[in-house]
Amino acid sequence: MLTFVGLGLYDLGDISVKGLEYVRNADTVFLEAYTSRLMGTDTAAMEAFFEKDIRVLGREDVEQTPREILECAAAGRVAFLTGGDPMVSTTHADLRMRAAAAGIETSIIHASSISSAVSGLSGLQNYRFGRSCSVPFPAKGWFPTAPIETIAANLALNLHTLVFLDIQNDRYMRVPEAIAVLEEMAEKRGIEPPALYVGIARAGSERPVVAAGAGANLKEMDFGPPLHILAVPADLHPMEREYLETFAGL
């Protein structure tokens, strides 16, 4: 049995009662630690809380060589822990399909997701979001412009864009850096950069930071520790504008 258990957004208080009960009764517990992180806790605290040893997995362990996960799931109850909600990532959908192909029963225990949290914190209506994108750390000889192209395509349809920010080991992209990268992409592609951004830090914590404004303003702002995420709004509905003025300093 392979059960995907969402941990929520920030700390151990975010897991559901159902998820907690399953993890504590699992035979094996894996933690996928590359698509997201819970910045309000760590692996040692999780092991103490769940009263279980936890095997931390990297991208290759899940996407390229998931044999150990599947073998454990064929023999007993496996809890596969993920930040946010498990099936927001296509990586996890692929693993579930591999398990099904091997005749292994699967299930999902849902949790809060950054996708819904952004709408709640920003007031941007969830049905007005188009395709999301991710901003990677630039590397020597590699500077993709797909993110700004996605944003431009959404804006042309009057749709908001959810922009995920890169995570690499202990390196986390911040909102000001992401805006600077997007502006460089826009210049490279000859695209007008977005006029308005909404930056969010530490969603799910007791004191998340939410700020809306022009890129020049948000690049000068200290959003504090990670994780950060960005939204690029299209034309604002009056209620969206009022919400951002009230809660995000627009």
Curated annotation (Swiss-Prot):
NCBIfam families: dph5
Organism expressing this protein natively: Methanoculleus marisnigri (strain ATCC 35101 / DSM 1498 / JR1)
GO terms assigned for molecular function: diphthine synthase activity
Role played: S-adenosyl-L-methionine-dependent methyltransferase that catalyzes the trimethylation of the amino group of the modified target histidine residue in translation elongation factor 2 (EF-2), to form an intermediate called diphthine. The three successive methylation reactions represent the second step of diphthamide biosynthesis.
Pfam families: TP_methylase
Origin superkingdom: Archaea
Similarity comment: Belongs to the diphthine synthase family.
GO BP term, example: methylation
Enzyme class: transferase
Protein's name according to its UniProt entry: Diphthine synthase
Subunit composition and interactions: Homodimer.
Catalytic activity: 2-[(3S)-amino-3-carboxypropyl]-L-histidyl-[translation elongation factor 2] + 3 S-adenosyl-L-methionine = diphthine-[translation elongation factor 2] + 3 S-adenosyl-L-homocysteine + 3 H(+)
UniProt binding sites for S-adenosyl-L-methionine: L9, D85, V88, S113, I114, L165, A203, H228
Associated pathway: Protein modification; peptidyl-diphthamide biosynthesis
Gene that this polypeptide is encoded by: dphB
Methyltransferase recorded as keyword: yes
This protein's UniProt keywords: Methyltransferase, S-adenosyl-L-methionine, Transferase
